[in-house]
From Swiss-Prot:
Family indicated by similarity: Belongs to the NrdI family.
Gene3D superfamilies: 3.40.50.360
Organism name: Wigglesworthia glossinidia brevipalpis
Name the record gives this protein: Protein NrdI
GO MF annotations in UniProt: FMN binding
Lineage: Bacteria, Pseudomonadati, Pseudomonadota, Gammaproteobacteria, Enterobacterales
SUPFAM superfamilies (alphabetical): Flavoproteins (SSF52218)
Amino acid sequence: MSVLVYFSSSSENTHRFVKKLCIPAKRIPLIDKKEFQIKSPYILVIPSYNNGILDTAVPHQVTNFLNTLHNKFFLKGVIGSGNKNFGVNFCIAGNIISKKYKVPLLYKFELLGTNKDVINVKNGINKFWKKLNLEKKNQNA
């Protein structure tokens, strides 16, 4: 089964958004206690931090998570969240992950997201997995 994996700080903005999706999701721990490993394809939901400053926009917990071979391998897409006050760096962490790991940036939303964002993300995720599964079938044919 495909899931969402997400990181949320103590503000819980991303957590609250992901809960509204009603999709199976696993949270990257705030405190790196032990290796957190995903063993199936997933989409990463990631907020941008530190006013979108490039060097620190991706939380270190996410960097550590993606430095694990399994986690890197199963990453299939990314959804970014952020604050529009960051200007051109709005959702920059999603852009960074998308480029670095060569996965599509599927959607961007601000802070807690709107009801429209929830609908768009749910529909987009369903379409994305269907497309990915179809491509996989065609490769195996």
